[in-house]
């Protein structure tokens, strides 16, 4: 373990990268608060940021606009910094239905959610890392601006253990219970502990592969050992270990009882208001619901919807912002906003949507006014908490350009020598027939095609029409969940189909080097789907291929089209000039086709079998060349596969377990051969 970032990469900065890295680092070290990295598709923005992180040596938070992009970034940074703490912090809900009230139909919708334990573990690991290591890089979504437990409580509750320390076993068990760990003598699961004589086994909530064994002798800690909870194998012995709370929302008994008193005071004031307004039904409803919650908190320390009382539990004043992931960041940290033209507006929108729903709940007596303070940060609060920042985008928005005050670092020249796609304009009248002929040409070359339409209906009709004419085509739309969307993009790259039709394909920002043609239908219809930024982003989808071309079907030239074409031409001119000057021959990007979500420690967002729509999923891994593996690699692979097999069997997924068993047998046979 090291406290310094160590970048591991088979290549060195090239093209515009060296100058961009030097400028970003110099600005950061000079104390510049905001700057923008304008990088075209395929220019190595992530690699550039990784070099900046290594040079400035500061804890880093990278914000992405969605889970899919966050998973991709997590995987990339993990490969760049294999010896450092790269973490993943996104919403842990597989499914979330917030509580709401619809006055027009007098309908109350109860909160309903499904928590993904794997992502919860990764969130806990992220906060622990930020508090304990300087070489920490956390990839997060907009989930970072939502309320968490206060870091002061989180730190004050932690259990610090050292060899030779005197501690009573009962006191130790009580402390673990305060951390919300549960005692389970039959099965050691994450967030649980068991007692065997003077030996305590604890499975830390933020870990997925290591458990802690505490061996006591006559009230003294004799030995601290990390072991594999599946096999019992000893991994290493320790001198000191810190156990962090099982949840970010853990709090002391005293704080909970104090909160009960302040909630009672608020309830009394609110009931007086409702009675004075003659809102008797609302008053009766609020009294009943709140009294039940108070009894639960007094007896067991928590209740359903306890987050609505977070202001009382954290001791904040009315209207004060809640503690968030930003409170866990050290003041000298670096903040990177990826795809900032999407992420920044997202941050601004979160507070307003949450507020309108909760105001209705408060008005009609379902919640106390303090529930309004369980909220995401307002935009100005987020700005105040943000450390020194780098906005990263191919099309920075007006906010980023204004905040950067002219400090724009460009990444236009690609290390591969690839130039931006040729842009052609063709008439709308024959767009479908023209598109079909272009698609056939690309299929002959073994390339893929992206088509963007304006409406769902048009996308569906076009998909059906192309399919009827023998073209292998799929349709990407908003009803498809994150994991399935990633699988569709992977299948496109693998050649399982040739054409992908969608409405807003640019939102992924994913790498698809096999795509050589992007067709934008009805490009002259001004709107957010055909704005300058959207057009540049969509054209950029073909920028990773040597034969890249974008066709805009339009009958008139709009301002957005002209601006997008001018910017693309400007970039092409600079790229061609650089290639001629340095004798570079452009070549297509050869990016391995792997599972993007593997970046988030395997199917992190996948639903458990039996929850939601059942669908087949890949169980066994892709066949590997086992002959090239050494004995240590084979042993590690076997152990990982066995863990997967046992987990599937435990979840009653016997077919999946059998597939992995067969893979284990093949690997064992290959190792013997």
Swiss-Prot record:
Molecular function GO labels: ATP binding; ATP hydrolysis activity; DNA binding; excinuclease ABC activity
User: Which residue ranges does the record assign to the Helicase C-terminal domain?
Assistant: 431-597
Q: Where is this motif: Beta-hairpin?
A: 92-115
Residue ranges occupied by any UVR domain in the UniProt entry: 635-670
Q: Does the keyword field hold Lyase?
A: no
What top-level branch of life does the organism fall under? Bacteria
Q: How does it assemble?
A: Forms a heterotetramer with UvrA during the search for lesions. Interacts with UvrC in an incision complex.
Q: What is known of its domains?
A: The beta-hairpin motif is involved in DNA binding.
Q: What is this protein called?
A: UvrABC system protein B
Q: Which organism is it from?
A: Xanthomonas campestris pv. campestris (strain ATCC 33913 / DSM 3586 / NCPPB 528 / LMG 568 / P 25)
**Lineage start:** Bacteria, Pseudomonadati, Pseudomonadota, Gammaproteobacteria, Lysobacterales
């Amino acid at each position: 373990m090291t406290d310094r970032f160590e970048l591991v990469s088979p290549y060195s900065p090239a093209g515009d990268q060296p100058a961009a890295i030097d400028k970003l680092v110099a600005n950061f070290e000079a104390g510049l608060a905001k700057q923008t990295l304008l990088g075209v598709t395929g220019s190595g923005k992530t690699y550039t940021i990784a070099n900046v992180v290594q040079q400035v040596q500061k804890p880093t938070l990278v914000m992405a606009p969605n889970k899919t992009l966050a998973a991709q970034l997590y995987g990339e940074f993990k490969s760049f910094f294999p010896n450092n703490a790269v973490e993943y912090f996104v919403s842990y809900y597989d499914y979330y239905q917030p509580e709401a009230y619809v006055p027009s139909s007098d309908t109350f919708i109860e909160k309903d959610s499904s928590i993904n334990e794997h992502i919860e573990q990764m969130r806990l690991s992220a906060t622990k890392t930020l508090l304990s290591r300087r070489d920490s890089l956390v990839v997060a979504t907009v989930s970072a601006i939502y309320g968490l437990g206060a870091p002061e409580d989180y730190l004050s509750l932690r259990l610090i253990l050292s060899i030779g320390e005197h501690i009573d076993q009962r006191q130790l068990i009580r402390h673990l219970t305060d951390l919300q760990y549960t005692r389970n003598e039959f099965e050691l699961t994450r967030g649980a502990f068991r007692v065997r004589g003077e030996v305590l086994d604890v499975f830390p909530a933020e870990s997925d592969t290591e458990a802690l064994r505490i061996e006591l002798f006559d009230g003294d800690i004799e030995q601290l050992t990390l072991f594999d909870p599946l096999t019992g194998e000893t991994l290493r012995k320790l001198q000191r270990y810190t156990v962090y709370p099982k949840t970010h929302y853990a709090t002391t008994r005293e704080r909970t009882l104090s909160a009960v008193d302040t909630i009672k005071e608020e309830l009394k004031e609110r009931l007086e208001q409702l009675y004075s307004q003659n809102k008797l039904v609302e008053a009766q409803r609020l009294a009943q619901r709140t009294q039940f919650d108070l009894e639960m908190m007094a007896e067991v320390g928590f209740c359903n919807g306890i987050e609505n009382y977070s202001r009382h539990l954290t001791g904040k004043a009315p209207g004060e912002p809640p503690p968030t992931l930003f409170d866990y960041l050290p003041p000298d940290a670096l903040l990177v906003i990826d795809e900032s033209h999407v992420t920044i507006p997202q941050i601004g929108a979160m507070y307003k949507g949450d507020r309108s729903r909760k105001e209705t709940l408060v008005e009609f007596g379902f919640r106390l006014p303090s529930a309004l303070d369980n909220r995401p940060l307002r935009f100005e609060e987020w700005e105040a908490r943000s450390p020194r920042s780098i906005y990263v985008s191919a099309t920075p928005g007006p906010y980023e350009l204004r905040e950067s005050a002219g400090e724009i670092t460009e990444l236009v020249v690609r290390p591969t020598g690839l130039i931006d796609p040729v842009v052609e304009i063709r008439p709308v009248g024959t767009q479908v027939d023209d598109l079909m002929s272009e698609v056939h040409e690309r299929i002959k070359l073994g390339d893929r095609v992206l088509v963007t339409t304006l409406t769902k209906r048009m996308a569906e009709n076009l998909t059906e029409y192309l399919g009827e004419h023998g073209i292998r085509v799929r349709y990407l739309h908003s009803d498809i969940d994150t994991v399935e969307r990633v699988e569709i993009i992977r299948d496109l790259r693998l050649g399982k189909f040739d054409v992908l039709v969608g409405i807003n394909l640019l939102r992924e920002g994913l790498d698809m080097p096999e795509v050589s043609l992007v067709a934008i239908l009805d490009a002259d219809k001004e709107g957010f789907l055909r704005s300058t930024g959207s057009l540049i982003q969509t054209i950029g989808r073909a920028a990773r291929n040597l034969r890249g071309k974008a066709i805009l079907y339009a009958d008139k030239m709009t301002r957005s089209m002209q601006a997008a074409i001018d910017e693309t031409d400007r970039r092409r001119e600079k790229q061609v000039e650089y290639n001629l000057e340095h004798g570079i021959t452009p070549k297509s990007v050869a990016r391995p086709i792997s599972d993007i979500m593997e970046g988030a420690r395997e199917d992190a967002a996948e639903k458990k079998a039996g929850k939601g729509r059942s669908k087949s999923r890949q169980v066994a891994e892709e066949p590997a060349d086992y002959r090239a593996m050494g004995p240590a690699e084979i042993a590690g692979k076997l152990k990982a596969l066995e863990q997967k097999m046992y987990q599937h069997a435990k979840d009653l997924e016997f077919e999946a377990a059998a597939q992995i068993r067969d893979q284990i047998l093949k690997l064992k046979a290959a190792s013997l051969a």
